[in-house]
Amino acid sequence: MKITYVGLIKVCFLVFLLLCATVLLNISWRQRDSSQSLQHCNSTCSAKYLETKLKEAHLTGRHKKWETYRLDAKPTSATGQGHQHFAKEPLQIKDLFIAVKTTKKYHGNRLNLLMQTWISRAKEQTFIFTDWEDQELRQKAGDQMVNTNCSAVHTRQALCCKMAVEYDKFVLSDKKWFCHLDDDNYLNLHALLDLLSTFSHSTDVYVGRPSLDHPVETVDRMKGDGSGSLKFWFATGGAGFCISRGLALKMSPWASMGNFISTAEKVRLPDDCTIGYIIEGMLDVKMQHSNLFHSHLEHLQRLPTESLLKQVTLSYGGPDNKWNVVRVNGAFSLAEDPTR
């Protein structure tokens, strides 16, 4: 019995030695294969090898399929403030929904200017939202004039009422971009298309110019119990702003079918501030700040003349500051062309 037990131990020891030898041999062969692969990689990944293959590709024409995919392409500044974006999609005027907010007393002096200038180049894309059924304007604009039936008084409620109608009409359209303007804005359509073409309408885009140099802080009446505060940026409506369709649809719970008015009442903010509240405060989407939009609150004479063609919107001073206009050299004097 003892002899059998000792013999079994010897057999097990021999089997163990054989297994160890097999493992060592496998490790040795794998290291050899790895060394050969590394040598092959070093030879085919060298700069000299790649340059040779690149020349061969140019000679055979095989590179043409990929020549538009430039890894070293430099993005261009889109918003005019250092923000950089790659071009996403071709854009045409027909893809825009341009909403112009106005009121009865400005149908004559302000709207006539717009109808004679930039609106004439985008008649089918521009909708005029007003508070009075003006038959003369109806004849000029047709169905592009929208009587909101909102109050003509310049109050938060009246402004939000018009913005609510603007939003709902855009959502019902098939347009890719919603752009809001005031009736004292001049719109450079080419510059607007250049700007929006750098984004995708299916992504979350909210672009405009803030009127303040800091975010607004207000009581958070929507998310919490009203004891906390919320900070957010908003694009001033006086300079104009644009929202992508993808983002506009996400705003629906707080903006569609009259909800915009109730949201504005809860947070007690005007129309453009409420837009920023919904986008930044509720949806947590950051506004794209752009200095290509301009309102009458700016010192417009400081804009360099050579940069005017690059600006998306321009404006002019009101009765209290009628000389606040851009500097433009031309055949007409300031008295003849007061809004420039």
From Swiss-Prot:
Residues 26-340 are lumenal. Pfam families: Fringe (PF02434). Its EC number is 2.4.1.222. The keyword Transmembrane helix applies. It is a single-pass type II membrane protein. GO terms for biological process: regulation of Notch signaling pathway. It is an enzyme of class 2 (transferase). It is found in: Golgi apparatus membrane. It catalyses: 3-O-(alpha-L-fucosyl)-L-threonyl-[EGF-like domain protein] + UDP-N-acetyl-alpha-D-glucosamine = 3-O-(N-acetyl-beta-D-glucosaminyl-(1->3)-alpha-L-fucosyl)-L-threonyl-[EGF-like domain protein] + UDP + H(+); 3-O-(alpha-L-fucosyl)-L-seryl-[EGF-like domain protein] + UDP-N-acetyl-alpha-D-glucosamine = 3-O-(N-acetyl-beta-D-glucosaminyl-(1->3)-alpha-L-fucosyl)-L-seryl-[EGF-like domain protein] + UDP + H(+). Has some activity with cobalt but not with magnesium, calcium and zinc. Substrate binds at R110, D183. Disulfide bonds join C150-C161, C179-C242. Belongs to the glycosyltransferase 31 family. This is Beta-1,3-N-acetylglucosaminyltransferase radical fringe. It comes from Xenopus laevis (African clawed frog). The lineage of its organism: Eukaryota, Metazoa, Chordata, Craniata, Vertebrata.
